[in-house]
Protein backbone atom coordinates (compact mmCIF):
# COMPACT_ATOMS: atom_id res chain seq x y z
CA UNK A 1 0.00 0.00 0.00
CA UNK A 2 1.61 3.27 -1.09
CA UNK A 3 1.79 6.08 1.40
CA UNK A 4 0.72 9.41 -0.11
CA UNK A 5 2.96 12.12 1.23
CA UNK A 6 1.55 15.15 -0.65
CA UNK A 7 -1.89 15.46 -2.13
CA UNK A 8 -2.74 18.24 -4.60
CA UNK A 9 -6.24 19.63 -4.28
CA UNK A 10 -8.54 19.82 -6.08
CA UNK A 11 -8.03 16.73 -8.20
CA UNK A 12 -10.86 17.46 -10.63
CA UNK A 13 -11.07 20.84 -12.29
CA UNK A 14 -14.44 20.67 -14.11
CA UNK A 15 -16.25 17.89 -12.31
CA UNK A 16 -18.55 20.09 -10.34
CA UNK A 17 -22.30 20.37 -10.09
CA UNK A 18 -23.72 23.59 -11.51
CA UNK A 19 -26.20 25.47 -9.37
CA UNK A 20 -29.71 25.95 -10.62
CA UNK A 21 -30.84 29.23 -12.09
CA UNK A 22 -27.61 29.92 -14.02
CA UNK A 23 -28.33 31.07 -17.54
CA UNK A 24 -24.78 30.88 -18.96
CA UNK A 25 -23.49 27.46 -17.95
CA UNK A 26 -20.35 27.60 -20.17
CA UNK A 27 -19.09 30.73 -18.50
CA UNK A 28 -19.74 29.22 -15.06
CA UNK A 29 -17.76 26.03 -15.84
CA UNK A 30 -14.88 28.10 -17.19
CA UNK A 31 -14.70 30.21 -14.04
CA UNK A 32 -14.84 27.12 -11.80
CA UNK A 33 -12.05 25.45 -13.79
CA UNK A 34 -9.83 28.53 -13.58
CA UNK A 35 -10.42 28.75 -9.83
CA UNK A 36 -9.47 25.08 -9.37
CA UNK A 37 -6.32 25.60 -11.43
CA UNK A 38 -5.33 28.50 -9.20
CA UNK A 39 -5.91 26.32 -6.13
CA UNK A 40 -3.76 23.56 -7.61
CA UNK A 41 -1.03 26.08 -8.33
CA UNK A 42 -1.17 27.29 -4.75
CA UNK A 43 -0.87 23.68 -3.52
CA UNK A 44 2.09 23.13 -5.82
CA UNK A 45 3.77 26.30 -4.57
CA UNK A 46 3.22 25.21 -0.98
CA UNK A 47 4.62 21.77 -1.61
CA UNK A 48 7.50 23.25 -3.53
CA UNK A 49 8.29 25.38 -0.50
CA UNK A 50 8.29 22.25 1.70
CA UNK A 51 10.50 20.34 -0.73
CA UNK A 52 13.03 23.14 -1.11
CA UNK A 53 12.96 23.73 2.62
CA UNK A 54 13.94 20.09 3.24
CA UNK A 55 16.64 20.35 0.59
CA UNK A 56 17.94 23.51 2.24
CA UNK A 57 18.12 21.77 5.62
CA UNK A 58 19.99 18.82 4.14
CA UNK A 59 22.40 21.15 2.33
CA UNK A 60 22.97 23.09 5.54
CA UNK A 61 23.81 19.97 7.52
CA UNK A 62 26.08 18.78 4.73
CA UNK A 63 27.92 22.11 4.61
CA UNK A 64 28.36 21.99 8.38
CA UNK A 65 29.95 18.55 8.16
CA UNK A 66 32.20 19.66 5.32
CA UNK A 67 33.33 22.71 7.28
CA UNK A 68 34.16 20.63 10.36
CA UNK A 69 36.09 18.20 8.18
CA UNK A 70 38.00 21.07 6.56
CA UNK A 71 38.96 22.45 9.95
CA UNK A 72 40.30 19.06 11.05
CA UNK A 73 42.26 18.70 7.83
CA UNK A 74 43.78 22.17 8.31
CA UNK A 75 44.87 21.35 11.85
CA UNK A 76 46.38 18.07 10.75
CA UNK A 77 48.20 19.68 7.84
CA UNK A 78 49.70 22.31 10.13
CA UNK A 79 50.85 19.74 12.66
CA UNK A 80 52.27 17.47 9.95
CA UNK A 81 54.12 20.09 7.93
CA UNK A 82 55.48 22.21 10.78
CA UNK A 83 56.44 19.50 13.28
CA UNK A 84 60.16 18.75 13.27
CA UNK A 85 60.84 15.36 14.86
CA UNK A 86 64.52 16.24 15.44
CA UNK A 87 63.78 19.27 17.59
CA UNK A 88 60.41 18.57 19.15
CA UNK A 89 59.76 15.20 20.72
CA UNK A 90 56.19 14.07 21.03
CA UNK A 91 55.64 12.76 24.53
CA UNK A 92 54.11 9.36 25.04
CA UNK A 93 51.58 10.84 27.43
CA UNK A 94 50.11 13.04 24.68
CA UNK A 95 49.65 9.99 22.50
CA UNK A 96 48.05 7.80 25.14
CA UNK A 97 45.88 10.47 26.78
CA UNK A 98 44.42 11.81 23.55
CA UNK A 99 41.02 10.38 22.79
CA UNK A 100 40.23 8.93 19.42
CA UNK A 101 37.99 10.82 17.04
CA UNK A 102 34.32 10.09 17.47
CA UNK A 103 31.83 11.18 14.89
CA UNK A 104 28.88 13.25 16.04
CA UNK A 105 26.75 12.28 13.07
CA UNK A 106 23.40 10.80 14.00
CA UNK A 107 22.63 7.57 12.25
CA UNK A 108 19.53 7.53 10.08
CA UNK A 109 17.12 5.31 11.96
CA UNK A 110 13.51 5.39 13.10
CA UNK A 111 12.51 7.22 9.97
CA UNK A 112 8.80 6.66 10.52
CA UNK A 113 8.61 8.05 14.01
CA UNK A 114 6.20 10.68 15.29
CA UNK A 115 9.07 13.16 15.63
CA UNK A 116 10.22 12.68 12.06
CA UNK A 117 6.73 12.89 10.59
CA UNK A 118 6.68 15.37 7.68
CA UNK A 119 4.29 18.29 7.70
CA UNK A 120 2.06 16.99 4.84
CA UNK A 121 1.71 13.64 6.61
CA UNK A 122 1.01 15.42 9.87
CA UNK A 123 -1.81 17.33 8.15
CA UNK A 124 -3.17 14.09 6.73
CA UNK A 125 -2.93 12.47 10.15
CA UNK A 126 -4.83 15.32 11.73
CA UNK A 127 -7.65 14.86 9.24
CA UNK A 128 -8.11 11.23 10.28
CA UNK A 129 -10.58 10.23 12.96
CA UNK A 130 -9.42 9.90 16.56
CA UNK A 131 -9.11 6.43 18.15
CA UNK A 132 -11.42 5.53 21.03
CA UNK A 133 -10.27 6.96 24.38
CA UNK A 134 -8.96 3.71 25.86
CA UNK A 135 -6.26 5.52 27.85
CA UNK A 136 -8.88 6.26 30.47
CA UNK A 137 -8.68 2.61 31.53
CA UNK A 138 -4.89 2.64 31.95
CA UNK A 139 -4.87 3.61 35.70
CA UNK A 140 -7.17 0.68 36.45
CA UNK A 141 -4.90 -1.95 34.90
CA UNK A 142 -2.74 -4.12 37.16
CA UNK A 143 -0.08 -5.02 34.58
CA UNK A 144 0.87 -1.37 33.96
CA UNK A 145 0.30 -1.52 30.21
CA UNK A 146 -1.39 1.21 28.29
CA UNK A 147 -4.94 0.49 27.30
CA UNK A 148 -4.64 2.17 23.90
CA UNK A 149 -1.88 -0.23 22.82
CA UNK A 150 -4.39 -3.07 22.71
CA UNK A 151 -6.27 -1.14 20.05
CA UNK A 152 -3.43 0.46 18.12
CA UNK A 153 0.32 0.21 18.73
CA UNK A 154 2.64 1.87 16.19
CA UNK A 155 5.78 0.39 17.83
CA UNK A 156 4.48 -3.19 17.83
CA UNK A 157 6.50 -4.42 14.86
CA UNK A 158 9.67 -2.72 16.00
CA UNK A 159 9.33 -4.18 19.49
CA UNK A 160 8.79 -7.62 17.98
CA UNK A 161 11.92 -7.28 15.85
CA UNK A 162 13.93 -5.96 18.81
CA UNK A 163 12.89 -8.87 21.03
CA UNK A 164 13.83 -11.36 18.36
CA UNK A 165 17.24 -9.78 17.80
CA UNK A 166 18.05 -9.71 21.51
CA UNK A 167 16.94 -13.32 21.93
CA UNK A 168 19.10 -14.43 19.01
CA UNK A 169 22.07 -12.60 20.53
CA UNK A 170 21.55 -14.28 23.89
CA UNK A 171 21.18 -17.71 22.25
CA UNK A 172 24.42 -17.27 20.35
CA UNK A 173 26.19 -16.22 23.53
CA UNK A 174 24.92 -19.30 25.40
CA UNK A 175 25.96 -21.53 22.52
CA UNK A 176 29.47 -20.08 22.58
CA UNK A 177 29.61 -20.56 26.33
CA UNK A 178 28.61 -24.24 25.99
CA UNK A 179 31.15 -24.75 23.21
CA UNK A 180 33.87 -23.20 25.34
CA UNK A 181 32.97 -25.41 28.31
CA UNK A 182 32.96 -28.46 26.05
CA UNK A 183 36.43 -27.59 24.77
CA UNK A 184 37.68 -27.21 28.34
CA UNK A 185 36.23 -30.59 29.39
CA UNK A 186 37.67 -32.37 26.36
CA UNK A 187 41.11 -33.88 27.13
CA UNK A 188 44.05 -32.38 25.34
CA UNK A 189 44.97 -34.55 22.41
CA UNK A 190 48.70 -34.87 21.76
CA UNK A 191 49.93 -33.51 18.49
CA UNK A 192 50.45 -36.21 15.93
CA UNK A 193 53.94 -36.16 14.52
CA UNK A 194 53.98 -37.24 10.87
CA UNK A 195 56.13 -40.22 10.05
CA UNK A 196 59.41 -39.31 8.46
CA UNK A 197 59.91 -40.65 4.93
CA UNK A 198 62.15 -43.68 4.62
CA UNK A 199 65.55 -42.65 3.27
CA UNK A 200 68.19 -45.24 2.44
CA UNK A 201 70.87 -42.71 1.60
CA UNK A 202 72.53 -43.17 5.01
CA UNK A 203 72.65 -46.94 4.56
CA UNK A 204 74.32 -46.58 1.19
CA UNK A 205 76.83 -44.12 2.67
CA UNK A 206 77.69 -46.62 5.42
CA UNK A 207 78.22 -49.34 2.85
CA UNK A 208 80.44 -46.99 0.82
CA UNK A 209 82.57 -46.07 3.86
CA UNK A 210 83.18 -49.64 4.86
CA UNK A 211 82.66 -51.51 8.10
CA UNK A 212 85.67 -49.84 9.76
CA UNK A 213 84.41 -46.26 9.47
CA UNK A 214 80.70 -46.94 9.74
CA UNK A 215 79.19 -46.32 13.14
CA UNK A 216 77.01 -48.77 14.86
CA UNK A 217 73.27 -48.20 14.43
CA UNK A 218 72.62 -48.56 18.13
CA UNK A 219 75.25 -45.97 19.07
CA UNK A 220 73.95 -43.57 16.44
CA UNK A 221 70.39 -43.98 17.68
CA UNK A 222 71.59 -43.48 21.26
CA UNK A 223 73.31 -40.24 20.25
CA UNK A 224 70.15 -38.98 18.55
CA UNK A 225 68.13 -39.74 21.67
CA UNK A 226 70.67 -37.93 23.85
CA UNK A 227 70.58 -34.90 21.57
CA UNK A 228 66.78 -34.81 21.65
CA UNK A 229 66.07 -35.65 25.28
CA UNK A 230 69.36 -35.05 27.09
CA UNK A 231 71.82 -37.72 28.29
CA UNK A 232 70.35 -41.06 29.28
CA UNK A 233 72.17 -40.99 32.59
CA UNK A 234 70.39 -37.80 33.61
CA UNK A 235 67.98 -39.64 35.83
CA UNK A 236 70.72 -41.87 37.28
CA UNK A 237 73.26 -39.17 38.10
CA UNK A 238 71.26 -37.14 40.54
CA UNK A 239 73.42 -35.81 43.37
CA UNK A 240 72.76 -37.95 46.42
CA UNK A 241 73.87 -36.89 49.84
CA UNK A 242 75.67 -39.85 51.27
CA UNK A 243 78.73 -40.44 53.40
CA UNK A 244 81.50 -42.74 52.16
CA UNK A 245 84.51 -44.26 53.85
CA UNK A 246 82.61 -44.91 57.05
CA UNK A 247 84.45 -48.11 58.02
CA UNK A 248 87.19 -48.59 60.54
CA UNK A 249 88.19 -45.69 62.72
CA UNK A 250 86.18 -43.27 60.53
CA UNK A 251 82.88 -45.13 60.80
CA UNK A 252 79.74 -43.39 61.87
CA UNK A 253 79.55 -45.42 65.05
CA UNK A 254 82.97 -44.14 66.11
CA UNK A 255 81.95 -40.50 65.87
CA UNK A 256 80.75 -38.64 68.95
CA UNK A 257 77.22 -37.31 69.07
CA UNK A 258 78.25 -33.74 68.28
CA UNK A 259 80.01 -34.66 65.04
CA UNK A 260 77.24 -37.08 64.15
CA UNK A 261 74.62 -34.32 64.55
CA UNK A 262 76.71 -31.90 62.49
CA UNK A 263 77.13 -34.51 59.77
CA UNK A 264 73.41 -35.22 59.62
CA UNK A 265 72.58 -31.50 59.53
CA UNK A 266 74.51 -30.95 56.29
CA UNK A 267 72.05 -33.00 54.27
CA UNK A 268 70.24 -31.14 51.50
CA UNK A 269 68.40 -33.90 49.66
CA UNK A 270 65.22 -35.66 50.60
CA UNK A 271 65.35 -38.83 52.63
CA UNK A 272 65.96 -41.94 50.55
CA UNK A 273 64.90 -44.40 53.25
CA UNK A 274 61.23 -44.74 53.94
CA UNK A 275 60.50 -43.96 57.58
CA UNK A 276 57.87 -46.68 57.97
CA UNK A 277 59.68 -49.42 56.01
CA UNK A 278 60.47 -52.51 58.12
CA UNK A 279 64.17 -53.33 58.44
CA UNK A 280 65.44 -55.99 56.01
CA UNK A 281 66.57 -59.34 57.40
CA UNK A 282 70.24 -59.45 58.35
CA UNK A 283 72.47 -61.08 55.71
CA UNK A 284 74.12 -64.38 56.42
CA UNK A 285 77.88 -64.17 56.95
CA UNK A 286 80.49 -66.84 57.10
CA UNK A 287 82.46 -67.90 60.11
CA UNK A 288 85.44 -65.76 59.15
CA UNK A 289 83.43 -62.61 58.53
CA UNK A 290 83.57 -60.90 61.88
CA UNK A 291 83.37 -57.35 60.59
CA UNK A 292 80.60 -55.40 62.37
CA UNK A 293 77.92 -53.94 60.14
CA UNK A 294 77.17 -50.30 60.89
CA UNK A 295 73.60 -49.19 61.14
CA UNK A 296 71.92 -46.84 58.65
CA UNK A 297 70.61 -43.71 60.27
CA UNK A 298 67.32 -42.26 59.00
CA UNK A 299 66.60 -38.78 60.20
CA UNK A 300 62.98 -38.92 59.07
CA UNK A 301 61.92 -40.38 62.40
CA UNK A 302 64.72 -38.91 64.46
CA UNK A 303 65.68 -42.41 65.80
CA UNK A 304 68.51 -44.82 65.07
CA UNK A 305 67.27 -47.81 63.12
CA UNK A 306 69.05 -51.10 62.88
CA UNK A 307 69.48 -51.27 59.09
CA UNK A 308 72.28 -53.70 58.14
CA UNK A 309 73.96 -52.86 54.87
CA UNK A 310 75.39 -55.19 52.31
CA UNK A 311 78.96 -56.29 53.15
CA UNK A 312 79.87 -56.64 49.49
CA UNK A 313 80.61 -52.97 49.02
CA UNK A 314 83.61 -51.41 50.65
CA UNK A 315 81.71 -48.28 51.53
CA UNK A 316 78.63 -47.92 53.67
CA UNK A 317 76.44 -45.11 52.32
CA UNK A 318 74.35 -43.42 54.96
CA UNK A 319 71.39 -41.58 53.44
CA UNK A 320 70.15 -38.61 55.31
CA UNK A 321 67.27 -36.17 54.91
CA UNK A 322 67.38 -32.34 54.61
CA UNK A 323 65.58 -31.86 57.91
CA UNK A 324 68.10 -31.86 60.74
CA UNK A 325 67.37 -34.35 63.54
CA UNK A 326 66.84 -33.14 67.09
CA UNK A 327 70.06 -32.91 69.09
CA UNK A 328 70.71 -35.95 71.32
CA UNK A 329 70.51 -35.59 75.09
CA UNK A 330 73.77 -34.72 76.84
CA UNK A 331 75.86 -37.70 77.79
CA UNK A 332 76.79 -38.23 81.43
CA UNK A 333 80.39 -38.10 82.45
CA UNK A 334 80.38 -41.75 83.42
CA UNK A 335 79.80 -42.85 79.81
CA UNK A 336 82.92 -42.96 77.68
CA UNK A 337 83.38 -42.99 73.93
CA UNK A 338 84.57 -46.56 73.93
CA UNK A 339 81.46 -47.79 75.72
CA UNK A 340 79.27 -45.86 73.28
CA UNK A 341 81.12 -47.35 70.32
CA UNK A 342 80.81 -50.83 71.74
CA UNK A 343 77.11 -50.39 72.46
CA UNK A 344 76.39 -49.14 68.93
CA UNK A 345 78.34 -51.88 67.13
CA UNK A 346 77.45 -54.90 69.25
CA UNK A 347 73.73 -54.84 69.90
CA UNK A 348 71.00 -52.57 68.61
CA UNK A 349 70.57 -49.82 71.19
CA UNK A 350 67.15 -48.78 72.45
CA UNK A 351 65.52 -45.91 70.58
CA UNK A 352 66.57 -42.49 71.80
CA UNK A 353 63.58 -40.49 73.00
CA UNK A 354 63.02 -37.10 71.44
CA UNK A 355 64.08 -34.08 73.48
CA UNK A 356 61.54 -32.49 75.80
CA UNK A 357 59.75 -29.39 74.54
CA UNK A 358 61.27 -26.02 75.38
CA UNK A 359 59.66 -24.30 78.35
CA UNK A 360 56.88 -21.96 77.36
CA UNK A 361 57.09 -18.43 78.59
CA UNK A 362 54.32 -16.18 79.80
CA UNK A 363 53.66 -14.93 76.26
CA UNK A 364 53.75 -18.37 74.62
CA UNK A 365 50.76 -20.46 75.57
CA UNK A 366 50.26 -23.50 73.29
CA UNK A 367 46.74 -24.29 72.28
CA UNK A 368 47.10 -27.95 73.39
CA UNK A 369 49.38 -28.65 76.38
CA UNK A 370 51.85 -31.44 75.49
CA UNK A 371 51.95 -34.47 77.78
CA UNK A 372 55.02 -34.51 80.02
CA UNK A 373 57.80 -36.83 78.85
CA UNK A 374 59.38 -38.85 81.69
CA UNK A 375 63.11 -38.57 82.19
CA UNK A 376 65.49 -41.51 81.74
CA UNK A 377 66.21 -42.09 85.39
CA UNK A 378 65.83 -44.96 87.77
CA UNK A 379 62.27 -46.03 88.45
CA UNK A 380 62.68 -45.34 92.12
CA UNK A 381 63.74 -41.73 91.68
CA UNK A 382 60.76 -40.38 89.74
CA UNK A 383 58.95 -37.86 91.91
CA UNK A 384 55.21 -37.33 91.53
CA UNK A 385 54.47 -34.08 89.81
CA UNK A 386 52.21 -31.62 91.58
CA UNK A 387 48.74 -30.97 90.17
CA UNK A 388 48.81 -28.84 87.03
CA UNK A 389 48.49 -25.12 87.37
CA UNK A 390 45.44 -23.53 85.84
CA UNK A 391 46.72 -20.99 83.32
CA UNK A 392 45.58 -17.51 84.34
CA UNK A 393 44.04 -15.16 81.83
CA UNK A 394 46.63 -13.50 79.62
CA UNK A 395 46.37 -11.03 76.76
CA UNK A 396 46.69 -12.18 73.15
CA UNK A 397 50.34 -12.49 72.27
CA UNK A 398 52.01 -12.01 68.87
CA UNK A 399 52.33 -15.15 66.74
CA UNK A 400 55.27 -17.35 67.71
CA UNK A 401 57.65 -18.27 64.90
CA UNK A 402 57.78 -21.95 65.87
CA UNK A 403 55.37 -23.85 68.09
CA UNK A 404 56.60 -26.25 70.73
CA UNK A 405 56.50 -29.86 69.45
CA UNK A 406 54.30 -32.35 71.21
CA UNK A 407 56.40 -35.18 72.56
CA UNK A 408 55.05 -38.69 72.63
CA UNK A 409 55.43 -40.98 75.61
CA UNK A 410 58.37 -43.36 75.15
CA UNK A 411 59.33 -46.33 77.36
CA UNK A 412 61.67 -45.48 80.20
CA UNK A 413 64.90 -47.50 80.24
CA UNK A 414 66.50 -47.79 83.69
CA UNK A 415 70.05 -46.56 84.13
CA UNK A 416 72.51 -47.24 86.95
CA UNK A 417 72.48 -44.99 89.98
CA UNK A 418 75.88 -43.56 89.06
CA UNK A 419 74.64 -42.39 85.73
CA UNK A 420 71.58 -40.79 87.28
CA UNK A 421 73.74 -38.57 89.42
CA UNK A 422 75.60 -37.32 86.33
CA UNK A 423 72.47 -36.04 84.63
CA UNK A 424 72.04 -32.27 84.49
CA UNK A 425 69.33 -30.76 86.66
CA UNK A 426 65.95 -30.16 84.98
CA UNK A 427 65.20 -26.69 83.63
CA UNK A 428 63.47 -24.29 86.00
CA UNK A 429 59.71 -23.87 85.64
CA UNK A 430 58.38 -21.01 83.53
CA UNK A 431 57.44 -17.83 85.37
CA UNK A 432 53.78 -17.43 86.09
CA UNK A 433 52.04 -14.58 84.26
CA UNK A 434 50.19 -11.90 86.21
CA UNK A 435 46.56 -12.73 86.99
CA UNK A 436 45.13 -9.91 84.84
CA UNK A 437 46.23 -11.31 81.47
CA UNK A 438 44.27 -13.55 79.14
CA UNK A 439 45.67 -16.50 77.24
CA UNK A 440 46.19 -16.34 73.50
CA UNK A 441 44.04 -19.44 72.99
CA UNK A 442 41.05 -20.56 75.07
CA UNK A 443 41.92 -23.43 77.42
CA UNK A 444 39.35 -25.20 79.53
CA UNK A 445 40.33 -24.89 83.17
CA UNK A 446 38.25 -27.84 84.26
CA UNK A 447 39.98 -30.18 81.81
CA UNK A 448 43.42 -29.22 83.08
CA UNK A 449 42.48 -29.87 86.68
CA UNK A 450 42.43 -33.66 86.06
CA UNK A 451 45.89 -34.88 85.04
CA UNK A 452 46.32 -38.27 83.35
CA UNK A 453 46.53 -41.01 85.93
CA UNK A 454 49.20 -42.97 84.05
CA UNK A 455 51.80 -40.23 84.03
CA UNK A 456 52.01 -39.40 87.76
CA UNK A 457 52.49 -42.30 90.20
CA UNK A 458 51.44 -42.14 93.81
CA UNK A 459 53.90 -40.90 96.40
CA UNK A 460 54.06 -44.34 98.06
CA UNK A 461 55.76 -45.90 95.01
CA UNK A 462 58.54 -43.31 94.77
CA UNK A 463 60.97 -43.82 97.66
CA UNK A 464 64.46 -42.39 97.75
CA UNK A 465 65.77 -38.91 97.13
CA UNK A 466 63.31 -36.65 95.42
CA UNK A 467 64.16 -34.77 92.25
CA UNK A 468 61.65 -31.93 92.11
CA UNK A 469 60.44 -31.29 88.56
CA UNK A 470 58.40 -28.18 89.35
CA UNK A 471 57.91 -26.29 92.59
CA UNK A 472 54.48 -26.77 94.09
CA UNK A 473 52.13 -23.97 93.37
CA UNK A 474 50.14 -22.23 96.09
CA UNK A 475 46.65 -23.62 96.56
CA UNK A 476 45.09 -20.28 95.72
CA UNK A 477 46.18 -20.62 92.07
CA UNK A 478 44.80 -24.12 91.59
CA UNK A 479 41.20 -24.11 90.43
CA UNK A 480 39.35 -27.39 90.97
CA UNK A 481 36.95 -28.69 88.37
CA UNK A 482 33.91 -28.34 90.59
CA UNK A 483 34.55 -24.71 91.48
CA UNK A 484 32.70 -22.27 89.20
CA UNK A 485 34.45 -19.44 87.44
CA UNK A 486 34.89 -16.41 89.63
CA UNK A 487 35.26 -13.88 86.84
CA UNK A 488 32.55 -14.05 84.16
CA UNK A 489 33.86 -13.94 80.61
CA UNK A 490 33.32 -10.66 78.82
CA UNK A 491 34.04 -12.12 75.39
CA UNK A 492 31.10 -12.36 72.97
CA UNK A 493 29.61 -15.74 72.33
CA UNK A 494 31.38 -17.44 69.45
CA UNK A 495 28.20 -18.83 67.94
CA UNK A 496 26.61 -15.37 67.81
CA UNK A 497 29.69 -13.86 66.22
CA UNK A 498 29.82 -16.63 63.65
CA UNK A 499 26.14 -16.32 62.88
CA UNK A 500 26.46 -12.56 62.49
CA UNK A 501 29.46 -13.03 60.21
CA UNK A 502 27.67 -15.64 58.11
CA UNK A 503 24.61 -13.43 57.88
CA UNK A 504 26.75 -10.50 56.75
CA UNK A 505 28.42 -12.69 54.14
CA UNK A 506 25.05 -13.88 52.87
CA UNK A 507 23.76 -10.33 52.70
CA UNK A 508 26.90 -9.24 50.87
CA UNK A 509 26.53 -12.02 48.32
CA UNK A 510 22.85 -11.24 47.88
CA UNK A 511 23.55 -7.52 47.46
CA UNK A 512 26.25 -8.30 44.93
CA UNK A 513 23.87 -10.47 42.94
CA UNK A 514 21.17 -7.80 43.06
CA UNK A 515 23.65 -5.15 41.93
CA UNK A 516 24.82 -7.30 39.04
CA UNK A 517 21.23 -7.98 38.05
CA UNK A 518 20.42 -4.27 38.14
CA UNK A 519 23.48 -3.51 36.05
CA UNK A 520 22.37 -6.03 33.46
CA UNK A 521 18.85 -4.61 33.44
CA UNK A 522 20.18 -1.07 33.13
CA UNK A 523 22.41 -2.19 30.30
CA UNK A 524 19.43 -3.62 28.45
CA UNK A 525 17.31 -0.57 29.19
CA UNK A 526 19.95 1.73 27.74
CA UNK A 527 19.50 0.09 24.35
CA UNK A 528 15.95 1.42 23.94
CA UNK A 529 14.97 1.54 20.28
CA UNK A 530 18.45 1.96 18.85
CA UNK A 531 18.64 -0.21 15.76
CA UNK A 532 22.35 0.38 15.23
CA UNK A 533 23.21 -0.73 18.77
CA UNK A 534 21.12 -3.89 18.49
CA UNK A 535 22.70 -4.85 15.19
CA UNK A 536 26.21 -4.03 16.42
CA UNK A 537 25.71 -6.22 19.49
CA UNK A 538 24.59 -9.12 17.37
CA UNK A 539 27.48 -8.73 14.93
CA UNK A 540 29.95 -8.47 17.80
CA UNK A 541 28.66 -11.69 19.37
CA UNK A 542 28.79 -13.54 16.06
CA UNK A 543 32.32 -12.54 15.11
CA UNK A 544 33.99 -12.35 18.51
CA UNK A 545 36.26 -15.12 19.81
CA UNK A 546 35.41 -14.67 23.46
CA UNK A 547 32.29 -13.80 25.39
CA UNK A 548 33.77 -10.65 26.89
CA UNK A 549 34.48 -9.10 23.51
CA UNK A 550 30.79 -8.87 22.69
CA UNK A 551 30.33 -5.71 24.72
CA UNK A 552 33.35 -3.79 23.47
CA UNK A 553 31.56 -1.34 21.22
CA UNK A 554 28.37 -0.81 23.16
CA UNK A 555 29.65 2.29 24.93
CA UNK A 556 30.88 3.78 21.68
CA UNK A 557 27.45 3.47 20.15
CA UNK A 558 25.60 4.84 23.13
CA UNK A 559 27.80 7.87 23.77
Curated annotation (Swiss-Prot):
Compositionally biased intervals (Polar residues): 304-313
Composition-biased stretches (Low complexity): 333-346
Stored CDD domains: WH2_WAVE-1
GO cellular component: a single term: SCAR complex
Biased composition (Pro residues): 322-332, 347-360, 384-399, 423-437, 460-477
Coiled-coil regions listed: none
Sites bearing Asymmetric dimethylarginine, chain numbering: 341
Region annotated Disordered, chain positions: 170-202, 304-400, 412-492
One of the record's GO molecular function terms: actin binding
GO terms for biological process, alphabetical: actin cytoskeleton organization; cellular response to brain-derived neurotrophic factor stimulus; lamellipodium morphogenesis; mitochondrion organization; positive regulation of Arp2/3 complex-mediated actin nucleation; pronuclear migration; receptor-mediated endocytosis
Residues carrying Phosphoserine: 489
Highest taxon above the source species: Eukaryota
Comp. bias regions, Basic and acidic residues: 182-202
Positions bearing Omega-N-methylarginine: 341
SMART domains: WH2 (SM00246)
Protein's UniProt keywords contain Cytoplasm: yes
Cellular localization per UniProt: Cytoplasm, Cytoskeleton; Synapse; Cell junction, Focal adhesion
WH2 domain boundaries: 497-514
Keyword terms of this UniProt record: Actin-binding, Cell junction, Cytoplasm, Cytoskeleton, Methylation, Phosphoprotein, Synapse
Written domain comment of the UniProt record: Binds the Arp2/3 complex through the C-terminal region and actin through verprolin homology (VPH) domain.
Described purpose of this protein according to its UniProt entry: Downstream effector molecule involved in the transmission of signals from tyrosine kinase receptors and small GTPases to the actin cytoskeleton. Promotes formation of actin filaments. Part of the WAVE complex that regulates lamellipodia formation. The WAVE complex regulates actin filament reorganization via its interaction with the Arp2/3 complex. As component of the WAVE1 complex, required for BDNF-NTRK2 endocytic trafficking and signaling from early endosomes. Also involved in the regulation of mitochondrial dynamics.
Family: Belongs to the SCAR/WAVE family.
Subunit structure: Component of the WAVE1 complex composed of ABI2, CYFIP1 or CYFIP2, BRK1, NCKAP1 and WASF1/WAVE1. Within the complex, a heterodimer containing NCKAP1 and CYFIP1 interacts with a heterotrimer formed by WAVE1, ABI2 and BRK1. CYFIP2 binds to activated RAC1 which causes the complex to dissociate, releasing activated WASF1. The complex can also be activated by NCK1. Binds actin and the Arp2/3 complex. Interacts with BAIAP2. Interacts with SHANK3; the interaction mediates the association of SHANK3 with the WAVE1 complex. Interacts with ABI1 (via N-terminus).
The protein's name: Actin-binding protein WASF1
Amino acid sequence: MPLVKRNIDPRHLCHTALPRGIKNELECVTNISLANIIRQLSSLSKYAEDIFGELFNEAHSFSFRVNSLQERVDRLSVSVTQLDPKEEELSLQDITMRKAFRSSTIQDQQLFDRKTLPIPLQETYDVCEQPPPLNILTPYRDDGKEGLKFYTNPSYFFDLWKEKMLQDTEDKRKEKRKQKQKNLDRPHEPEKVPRAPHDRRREWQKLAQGPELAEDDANLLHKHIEVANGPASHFETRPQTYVDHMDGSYSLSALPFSQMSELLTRAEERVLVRPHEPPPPPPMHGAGDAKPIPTCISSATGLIENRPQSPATGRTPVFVSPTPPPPPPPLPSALSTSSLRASMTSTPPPPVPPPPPPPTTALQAPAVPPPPAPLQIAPGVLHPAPPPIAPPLVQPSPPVARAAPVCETVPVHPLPQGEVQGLPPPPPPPPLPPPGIRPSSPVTVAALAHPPSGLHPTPSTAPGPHVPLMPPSPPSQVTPASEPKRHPSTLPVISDARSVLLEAIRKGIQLRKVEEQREQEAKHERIENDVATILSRRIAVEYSDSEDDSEFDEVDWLE
